[in-house]
């Protein structure tokens, strides 16, 4: 997605050969025009898949997920990372290790919002090692929901997340695929157009 690549090039900050900071438009401050376009793109990619729900993880996945939900006209459910006074029973849970925070947490979704009749699109802001994605897939599996695929805003293709999800049989659609963050520079994967 050209608009997203331009945003990454112009406003993304390479902190190391593993970490890209995008808090100017995605992780802290949110660019609503960009999020709208991201939602439209995910809707276009998954419009024939019978999506009934979108699931994501708090908090950076929420904006792109809501925009995709709006475009597809389906509800969005986000997995919580922290305990909530109102989210206490009938929980679907998974353990997830955060690459950027270097901490393991338990994510949870109420089973009243996800079930066996659902066909879900899983959306997240980043795909690195695939831990959050695998955790969300595990929650969908517990609910006996079908996973249509993963919509990833930014994929770090030099890390094993995509390969792990593909080996598990999942479809992965990433709007920006980063090949490298070496020498403080973002290098994108060259996509072959068919």
UniProtKB/Swiss-Prot annotation:
Reactions the enzyme catalyzes: XMP + diphosphate = xanthine + 5-phospho-alpha-D-ribose 1-diphosphate
Gene3D superfamilies named in the record: 3.40.50.2020
UniProt keyword Glycosyltransferase, yes or no: yes
EC numbers: 2.4.2.22
Annotated GO CC locations: cytoplasm
Binding site for xanthine: 20, 27, 156
Annotated signal sequence range: none
Any one Gene Ontology molecular-function term assigned to this protein's record: xanthine phosphoribosyltransferase activity
Binding site for 5-phospho-alpha-D-ribose 1-diphosphate: 128-132
Keywords, in A-Z order: Cytoplasm, Glycosyltransferase, Purine salvage, Transferase
Pathway(s) where this gene product acts: Purine metabolism; XMP biosynthesis via salvage pathway; XMP from xanthine: step 1/1
Database matches in PANTHER family: HYPOXANTHINE/GUANINE PHOSPHORIBOSYLTRANSFERASE (PTHR43864), XANTHINE PHOSPHORIBOSYLTRANSFERASE (PTHR43864:SF1)
Subunit structure: Homodimer.
Name this protein carries in UniProt: Xanthine phosphoribosyltransferase
Organism of derivation: Bacillus pumilus (strain SAFR-032)
Gene: xpt
């Amino acid at each position: 997605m050209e608009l997203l690549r331009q945003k990454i090039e112009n406003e993304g900050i390479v902190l190391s050969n593993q970490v890209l900071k995008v808090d100017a438009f995605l992780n802290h401050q949110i660019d609503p025009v960009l999020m709208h376009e991201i939602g439209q793109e995910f809707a276009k990619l998954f419009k024939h898949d019978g999506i009934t729900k979108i699931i994501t993880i708090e908090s950076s996945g929420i904006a792109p997920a809501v925009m995709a939900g709006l475009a597809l006209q389906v509800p969005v459910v986000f997995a919580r990372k922290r305990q909530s006074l109102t989210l206490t029973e009938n929980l679907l849970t998974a353990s997830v290790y955060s690459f950027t925070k270097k901490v393991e947490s338990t994510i949870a979704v109420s089973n009243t919002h996800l079930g066996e009749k659902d066909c879900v699109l899983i959306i997240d802001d980043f795909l690195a090692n695939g831990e959050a994605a695998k955790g969300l897939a595990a929650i969908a599996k517990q609910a006996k929901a079908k996973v249509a695929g993963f919509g990833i805003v930014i994929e770090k293709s030099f890390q094993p997340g995509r390969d792990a999800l593909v080996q598990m049989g999942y479809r992965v659609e990433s709007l920006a695929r980063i090949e490298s963050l070496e020498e403080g520079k973002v290098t994108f994967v060259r996509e072959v157009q068919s």
